[in-house]
A protein has these predicted regions:
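Amphipathic coiled-coil/heptad-repeat helices and related helical stalk/stem segments
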Residues: 54-58, 130-133, 153
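Surface-exposed amphipathic alpha-helices with a cationic face
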Residues: 62-66, 138-141, 161
Length: 175
């Protein structure tokens, strides 16, 4: 049984790529002959829908927290060009969420809007992931309500832990 203030915390934050979703196939199929990532292929809605696979243990964790009444928030550095494909992928794999926030498309000019339904702000598009997710936290979630964060990237995990948040790192993430 949980005791004290921890019982009042009702938000669990999940990362998407490398955490809820295994992106190995999408990443491998998006590499150019020169070894660099082809961002147009990597960020395309079709690539997300067809190549990403569910990370079942992490999805099960999200389902259990959701079933226990926790608010499930997904913060991702994923480009919002795939916002609707991401929502479709989450639904297809029974990933519950109350809020989904993706990085605004950084490859578009300033006239390009943030994806309809994505609550992110346009200034978030060029931030490194650890700064982006801190901004997302500050904008969309009360830090005092966060029970747990689940992520994979070392720099982001360090940021969460430096804020005093309990954080599970689901995979090595030195990138």
């Amino acid at each position: 049984m949980l005791k004290g203030d921890i019982m009042n915390k009702k938000t669990v934050i999940f990362d998407l790529d490398g955490t809820l979703a295994n992106i190995d196939v999408r990443r491998d199929r998006s590499v150019k002959p020169n070894g660099k990532l082809n961002w147009d292929i990597f960020a395309s809605p079709d690539s997300i829908l067809h190549w990403d696979t569910p990370n079942e243990p992490v999805i099960k964790m999200a389902q259990m927290f959701h079933n226990d009444g926790f608010r499930i928030v997904i913060f991702s550095g994923r480009n919002d060009r795939g916002f609707f494909a991401t929502k479709e992928w989450l639904k297809k794999h029974d990933v519950p969420f109350d809020l989904l926030v993706l990085r605004p498309d950084k490859f578009q000019d300033k006239s390009w809007p943030v994806a309809d339904g994505n609550p992110a702000t346009f200034d978030m598009r060029f931030m490194p992931d650890e700064i982006l997710k801190k901004k997302m936290l500050d904008t969309f979630v009360d830090i005092n309500d966060v029970f747990l964060v689940v992520d994979d990237r070392d720099k982001v995990v360090k940021m969460w832990r430096d804020l005093g948040l309990n954080t599970f790192q689901v995979a090595p993430g030195d990138f």
